[in-house]
UniProtKB/Swiss-Prot annotation:
Function field: O-methyltransferase that catalyzes the 2 O-methylation steps in the ubiquinone biosynthetic pathway.
Superkingdom, natural source: Bacteria
Enzyme class: transferase
EC numbers for this chain: 2.1.1.222, 2.1.1.64
InterPro entries per record: SAM-dependent_MTases_sf (IPR029063), UbiG_MeTrfase (IPR010233)
Species assigned in the record: Photobacterium profundum (strain SS9)
Catalytic activity as recorded in UniProt: a 3-demethylubiquinol + S-adenosyl-L-methionine = a ubiquinol + S-adenosyl-L-homocysteine + H(+); a 3-(all-trans-polyprenyl)benzene-1,2-diol + S-adenosyl-L-methionine = a 2-methoxy-6-(all-trans-polyprenyl)phenol + S-adenosyl-L-homocysteine + H(+)
Protein name per UniProt: Ubiquinone biosynthesis O-methyltransferase
Length: 235
């Protein structure tokens, strides 16, 4: 019997169609470029630096975070199930000279091949795009070394996140294309922590990601009502 992959074909197709514009700083992925320094600094600070670390970026897309970690001196592998985003990621790395690998594979498949391999695993803005986020979390836990770090980021599911992420970001401000997100797939922090608790990971820190449309500015803060990041360590 063929094992069913933890992949939503509609989600893959959506990002395949936008792949050529992944590194357009004023295009659909502008918000990812804007928040990337925040994500990079958060991972760097909480993991005790990146230089020389072996890192897996799950759901890497066109490689924005993966490439920035490689530039910091990490040994990075980017993992995704979108062929076009990975092609764009590889081409951009050639242009910049960044040294990293990209692999077309699910997190679950990678975990079977490379258990307890990575010092750091990042899984950013990905869990809300797969049918079974708990399976991805378990795979990330399997792939990280003992005492290694795993980072997850996603969107909370409540009225405010619908207003900000769907109505605001997609419909009014057009920060991202309509249909980028499905509010029903957003994950409450309590739900994410419950899934983490089913693995050897222990949650250590949580922070929110905030946006001011008047100043077009992002920052990290205490409130986790919309976007948030969780730092975990493998026991």
């Amino acid at each position: 019997m063929t094992k069913q992959l933890n992949v939503d074909p509609a989600e893959i197709s959506k990002f395949e169609d936008m792949a050529s514009r992944w590194w357009d700083l004023e295009g659909e992925f502008k918000p990812l470029h804007q928040i990337n320094p925040l994500r990079l600094n958060y991972v760097t600070d909480h993991a005790g630096g990146l230089f020389g670390k072996k890192i897996l970026d799950v759901g890497c897309g066109g490689g924005i975070l993966a490439e920035s970690m490689a530039i910091e001196g990490a040994d990075v592998t980017g993992l995704d199930m979108g062929k076009e985003p990975l092609t764009v990621a590889r081409l951009h790395a050639l242009e910049t000279g960044a040294k990293l690998d990209y692999v077309l594979r699910t997190a679950e498949e990678q975990a079977e091949l490379h258990p307890e391999t990575y010092d750091i695993v990042t899984c950013m803005e990905m869990l809300e795009h797969v049918p079974n986020p708990a399976s991805v979390i378990a795979a990330c836990a399997k792939m990280v070394k003992p005492n290694g770090h795993v980072f997850f980021s996603t969107l909370n599911r409540n009225a405010k996140s619908y207003l900000f992420a769907i109505v605001g970001a997609e419909q009014l401000l057009k920060l991202v294309p309509k249909g980028t997100h499905d509010h029903k797939k957003f994950i409450r922090p309590s739900e994410l922590i419950a899934m983490i608790d089913q693995t050897p990971l222990q949650d250590r820190h949580i922070t929110g990601l905030h946006y001011n449309p008047l100043t077009d500015n992002y920052w990290l803060g205490k409130s986790v009502e919309v976007n948030y990041i969780v730092h975990t360590v493998k026991l």
